[in-house]
Amino acid sequence: MSKNYAPFIKPYMQYNEHGWGPCELDVVDVPYQPFSKSDRLGKITDWTVTQQDKKFTNKYASSFGNNNQYAYFHEEDDESFRLVDSVGSKVIKPYQRGRGFRPSVHNNPRNVRNQRGRKGNAMGNIMGPGLASITQRYGKGRDGRRNQGRKYRNLPARLRESSVVVQSDWVSVKEIDFPRLLKLSLPNMKEGEDIVTCGALDYYDKAYDRVNLKNERTLMKIDRIVHTATTTDDPIIRRLSKTMGNVFATDDILATIMCCTRSNYSWDVVIEKLGTKIFFDKRDNVKFDMLTVNETSQEPPMDEEGSNNSAHSLSMEATFINHNFSQQVLKMGAEENKFKLAEPNPFEEAGVELASMGYRYKQWDLGNDITLVARCKHNGVTQLPNGDMQFLSIRALNEWDSKAANSIEWRQKLDSQRGAVLSTELRNNACKLAKWTVESVLAGSDQLKLGYVSRVSPRDHLRHVILGTQQFKPQEFATQINLNMDNCWGILRCLIDIIRMQPDGKYLIMKDPNKPMVRIYHIPENAFDSDVSEEEESSEDKPFGLSMNN
């Protein structure tokens, strides 16, 4: 049987009798490749790569053989003579990994500072000392951040203003940063129970579902009043506070608190603790009811006050667009039917046309003997083919400049890439969309209608057109935008527990204008009495106070 197997022949092994390593004579004909320790080893090829590194194309190339002096040119003997190049050949430097760094004219920090100073002086001669100082202080786009470290690039370009000036007699109670708030959770929250329903709703005009870029509609100005009364000014909440609940608020106040971790701008909420009852209020100013524009964008509006594209002007524009759109898409008119709720509008006035608004007063059990009573709202109603009614929350997104940073031109992408447009809005207006979603969930709306409204001209902030509409189910939309309702309820419950442990009095919750944190202050009872008197004196000049009249 052994004859069937091939014989085993021992391989030839080199043996160096006079030293260590391979024999010198045996490796004479082995080809040798020069090696430099600056070469990157360990990567032979990558068949899955889609594109090469454009910045360092010679990252994996050898340091030897790249320059012209090592190149071989096959030429005829009679053409071997050539003139000497006095310019010199261009030396291709190998890819370096941080070794042998020496400061030079270009990378020396001192020279960078000197060049920056000379550049500022030159700009000052052209633009004047005022604009030059602003350029030196805040930089100019990418050029202003080019020579800064990575950790400084994401800092705000300028300090934001606080929504309220903290006085010296205010006592700090608590400071909670956003990472701690994001860890809170209050799961298994049940749907709120209806207590009282008030108001009348117009029916939705389904013709606006067919609006697109080729069939746009002009946005009209609707002369209707929307009341934005705070908690303690609501007659229904005053009546309910005598018999039920111990925490009272409105949906916009709750949404602001629940979505505080997504906010960048400063805001404040006043809290009054009277025994076992807690009232969440907003101050008598119009800023709380204003909609923000590009609040969470990497480059929020930075124009000066008075400009059409300043933060305040854009906020006013977005607020009026939202009001007009929410009424225009409804079937208005005396001959149109209305869906009336159990009780009339509590803010009804003689001779004043109110906007289509349905108020729903609901209560939630937050545990630990906490019963929340809040006023929520619907904007419209629609009837299904089977006869069922669906309540709507109607909101509008507005485009103010298609050429702005981190934006997509709606007139080109809205019909074909609506998902990309909405994704961009979620990135630039994450806080505003989250608050709209929370308000819809609290009210129990069946649909959240979003409208896309754009300026007729980028420089004209008074005329707008409707480019399209889109609808979502609030709970599903909350999942799409990564809005955790358990975390929202946990944040609210945490702040309520902190206030319950404090003595009776007035408190204020404020979002820090420049830090991701919420501060709680104990303030005097007459803290905002001067603001109230100023508001009453200038009530004729305000665009809207407790009511928004467009």
UniProtKB/Swiss-Prot annotation:
Family matches, as InterPro entries: eIF3d
Family: Belongs to the eIF-3 subunit D family.
GO cellular component, one term: eukaryotic translation initiation factor 3 complex
Domain remark in the UniProt entry: The RNA gate region regulates mRNA cap recognition to prevent promiscuous mRNA-binding before assembly of eif3d into the full eukaryotic translation initiation factor 3 (eIF-3) complex.
Keywords: Cytoplasm, Initiation factor, Phosphoprotein, Protein biosynthesis, RNA-binding
Protein's UniProt name: Eukaryotic translation initiation factor 3 subunit D-2
Signal peptide: none
Cross-referenced PANTHER family: EUKARYOTIC TRANSLATION INITIATION FACTOR 3 SUBUNIT 7 (PTHR12399), EUKARYOTIC TRANSLATION INITIATION FACTOR 3 SUBUNIT D (PTHR12399:SF0)
Protein's UniProt keywords contain RNA-binding: yes
Region annotation Disordered: where it falls in the sequence: 97-126, 530-550
Lineage of source species: Eukaryota, Metazoa, Ecdysozoa, Arthropoda, Hexapoda
Pfam family, one: eIF-3_zeta
Subunit and partners: Component of the eukaryotic translation initiation factor 3 (eIF-3) complex. The eIF-3 complex interacts with pix.
Region annotated RNA gate, chain positions: 287-301
Compartments where located: Cytoplasm
Role this protein plays: mRNA cap-binding component of the eukaryotic translation initiation factor 3 (eIF-3) complex, which is involved in protein synthesis of a specialized repertoire of mRNAs and, together with other initiation factors, stimulates binding of mRNA and methionyl-tRNAi to the 40S ribosome. The eIF-3 complex specifically targets and initiates translation of a subset of mRNAs involved in cell proliferation. In the eIF-3 complex, eif3d specifically recognizes and binds the 7-methylguanosine cap of a subset of mRNAs.
Record bears the keyword Protein biosynthesis: yes
GO aspect biological process, one term: cap-dependent translational initiation
GO molecular function annotation: mRNA cap binding; translation initiation factor activity
